[in-house]
Amino acid sequence: MTTLVVVATRAEAAPVPAGLDVVVTGLGKTAAAVATTRAILERDRKGLVVVNIGSAGALREGVEGLHEVGTVLNHDISAEAIRALGYDPQEELRVGDAEVVLASGDLFVTDPAVRDELARRAHLVDMEGYAVAYACRQLDVPVRLVKHVSDNADESALDWPALVDLSARELGRWLADHAPG
């Protein structure tokens, strides 16, 4: 089995253990989907597993630390409107057995009203997880999403550049202990 580690930023990639293949996607769903797809197509897919690591905002009180995601949502798509047109928006993907739900979108969540709305459906929020999972699903490559809480998806998210290093170190330790191949 070969692991491809997918991260949004160089800061999140810095603590990845030597010897693991790493792709830095850039921020947001479009950048993540394109970079993940390109990276998968450039590699032998037999035995490949993608591990998307990164920081995330906590949407609920008491959610902290490191989490493996079981379900990921595309939170800023008009799913009901798309469904009404007769199409499946595939806004929710099951990626593992964990109960943690991650909401991904191109919004940097700092607004308490947005946070509260997302908290009804998810535990964590990020900007890339859904896109990575969707690309993997389309290319029949297994994926794991592992996130570390860096902020509370409120005004503290504006301090993200200062907080991401702690998350990156924790994720690097997790990879050293759990990443296959």
Whereabouts are the PLM-identified features?
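Glycine-rich phosphate- or other oxyanion-binding loops that anchor nucleotides, phosphorylated ligands
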Residues: 9-181
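Extreme N-terminal starter segment of soluble prokaryotic enzymes
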Residues: 1-4, 48
